[in-house]
Amino acid sequence: MPDLLSIEGLRAGYGEAVVLPGMTLTLAEGQVLALLGRNGTGKTTLINSIVGITRRFGGSLALGGLDITTMRPDQRARAGIGWVPQERNIFRSLTVEENMTAVAQPGPWTVEKVYEMFPRLKERRNNFGNQLSGGEQQMLAIGRALTLNPKVLLLDEPTEGLAPIIVEELLKALGTITRAGGICSIIVEQNAQKILGLADRVVILERGAIVHDAASHALKADPAVLERYLGVAGAAAH
């Protein structure tokens, strides 16, 4: 299967600080990658670098064969990079539906399809973003990213701070997205066990470099790897 996302020798960071000293990573269409690591290992920096909001010191990025290295974040979004940041960044002064129609691009992920996945959003379609609970805001952030009909979906700790019942609903939705095919996903998640059942590949970062890259079932069978790189088996730090 051809690579959908290709990162080659990426050196990136903030200001003069290099956080990623030379990242090389590829993802195939439909692949779901769980990105794990302790706090400060470069997970969010990698996500932000794909989005285009870090300083790039070197290296290249390609999406479906298209060189996006020098593209602005808005150009990358139109090219097919969907992003759900930790802060969610929904439009609080727009309604649920307006949040999605404002960015929607033609494709299989329509507003109505998002409503099928998140019935709660349909019930709140005329409510403003600032009237939603934290879980509803996260559903909206994911739904809005999907209506862009991205090729790559980036989710930075999508379940952080949410009630267990909402977490289960979100994980079920993420499973629906991955089964729909066509999109490759990178998910940063602080609880490894929570995400291993969803991902088919796991990458662990340490000091901005990949120290483990394997199928998720292999990591399940070797909890010592989680213990070694994350400190506590089954739990990944921010």
Predicted regions and their residues:
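ABC ATPase C-loop
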Residues: A145-L146
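Catalytic Walker B motif of ABC-type/P-loop ATPase nucleotide-binding domains
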Residues: L153-E157
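The feature captures the beta-strand-to-loop junction immediately N-terminal to the Walker
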Residues: L36-R38
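Conserved ABC transporter NBD signature motif
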Residues: G59-L66, A79, W109, K113-E116, ...
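Helix-to-loop junction immediately C-terminal to a conserved catalytic motif
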Residues: V51
